[in-house]
Amino acid sequence: MRSSPRVPSAALALCMVLLSFGSSALVEPKADVAAATLAWGQAIGGGDPEKVLPLYSDDAVLWGTLSPTVRSDRAAIRDYFVSAFKVLPGLKVTYGDQLIRVYGNAAVNTGYYTFSYVKDGETKNLPARYSFTYVKNGERWLIVDHHSSAMPSTHR
C-alpha cells in the first residue's frame, strides 16, 4: 500500500502566505488609487493650488466643474484652481460612491462628489460627477485626465 506524500507544514504555510500576497496584490492598487483620490480632496480642502498641482501629471488635462474651457497645461490647471478657490471660499469635497478600475499602470476612478463652500455666510452644496484617470509614476498615482461636471437636475 502506497501512502501519499506529505507536505511539510512549513511548505504549506509558505504557500498560504504567497497566496495571500496574490490576493492583496489585486486589492492594493485600487486602495492606492482611492488614497490618491482622497489626497486630491484633502488638497482641495486646503485651498492652496500649490498643494493640488503636484497630484497632476505634467501632461494632465482638466475639464473642471466651473469652467467650459479644457485645461491642458500646468499653468492653466493652476489658474483654474486659483479661480475656483476664490469663487468657492471654504471649498471642501465629500465623496459618494466610487468605481475604481486598474489596468496595470493606469487606473480610472469614476464616481460622484459634493463640493461644499460658504457664500454670504451660508454653506452651499454643489453635487458633481467625476472621472479621474491615473497613471502610476514610480510609487505615486498621478492624475493624467480629470473630468468633473455638475450633477444634472432631475426632470420629473
Q: Would you name each region that the model predicts?
A:
Residues 100-107, 122, 134-140:
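A short, structured loop/turn motif at beta-sheet edges
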Residues 1-12:
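Bacterial N-terminal signal peptides that target proteins for export
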Residues 81, 95-100, 113-115, 129-135:
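Hydrophobic/aromatic beta-strand elements that line small-molecule binding cavities or substrate pockets
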Residues 59-60, 67-69, 114-116, 149-153:
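Solvent-exposed loop/turn segments at secondary-structure junctions
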Residues 105-115:
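A short hydrophobic beta-strand element
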Residues 30-36, 49-105, 124-125:
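A solvent-exposed, acidic/Ser-Thr-rich amphipathic alpha-helical stretch
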Residues 15-58, 154-156:
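Short, low-complexity N-terminal intrinsically disordered segments enriched in polar/charged residues
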Residues 127-154:
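Short beta-strand edge/turn micro-motifs at domain boundaries
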